[in-house]
């Protein structure tokens, strides 16, 4: 149960971690493949276009996944690598995160099975982590993405917050335009553009505040009235 009068929603890619996890997954899936460098560049460009709001997130996600044939074992490799990419100021402030975990959610267009290990290592609650999930066949093989999941859709973060009935003061922290969607929820919702890992002018232009590191986010809460 949330005891405080605020809810903090964190993005994952380029926020909690310093990179885009799908870009790294692409490098793993395509290693030793012909034209892998060219395909990875295309995937990274699509990631950037989606984060800047130049194409919809759903369009960006679908186009990126078309380039990849993802196998289950790829996630084992990805999870081993990702623990080395947690943002420095996030590591520094793990105690604060754990102390306030009842009020902290993760909303991400990334994959929940990738996010969960990082979230747990930071002391956050797995049942407050929301991300995209795969559909599996009877033999356990990945059949595709669950496009019924709200986070696979454009405007998904807003739709998810609405579905969860979030009525507290909402503070969304992230690096992309998809994170700013939360401002549609309520006039009191605050979007903080997170720039520790990447800074996008189009995102800063619509942000209520900027955080160079997670220390700035903590300062915001310290100064809340």
Question: Where are the predicted features?
Answer:
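Alpha-helical substrate-recognition element adjacent to the catalytic core
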Residues: 2-8, 12-122, 126-133
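Amphipathic coiled-coil/heptad-repeat helices and related helical stalk/stem segments
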Residues: 86, 90, 154-157, 176
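Anion (oxyanion) recognition and catalysis
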Residues: 98, 120-123, 165, 184, ...
């Amino acid at each position: 149960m949330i005891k405080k009068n605020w809810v903090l929603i964190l993005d994952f890619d380029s926020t909690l971690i310093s990179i885009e996890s799908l870009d790294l997954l692409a490098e793993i899936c395509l290693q030793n493949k012909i034209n892998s460098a060219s395909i990875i560049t295309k995937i990274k460009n699509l990631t950037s276009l989606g984060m800047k709001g130049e194409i919809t997130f759903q369009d960006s996600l679908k186009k990126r996944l078309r380039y990849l044939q993802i196998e289950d074992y790829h996630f084992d490799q990805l999870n081993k690598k990702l623990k080395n990419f947690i943002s420095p100021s996030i590591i520094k402030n793990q105690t604060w995160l754990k102390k306030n975990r009842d009020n902290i959610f993760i909303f991400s267009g990334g994959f929940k099975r990738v996010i969960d290990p990082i979230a747990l290592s930071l002391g956050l609650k797995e049942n407050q982590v929301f991300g995209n999930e795969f559909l599996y066949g009877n033999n356990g093989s990945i059949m595709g993405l669950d496009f019924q999941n709200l986070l696979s859709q454009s405007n998904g973060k807003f739709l998810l917050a609405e579905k969860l009935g979030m009525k507290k003061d909402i503070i969304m922290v992230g690096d992309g335009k998809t994170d700013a969607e939360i401002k549609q929820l309520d006039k009191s919702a605050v979007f903080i553009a997170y720039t520790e890992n990447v800074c996008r002018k189009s995102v800063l232009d619509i942000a209520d505040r900027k955080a160079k590191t997670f220390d700035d986010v903590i300062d915001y809460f310290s100064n809340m009235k």
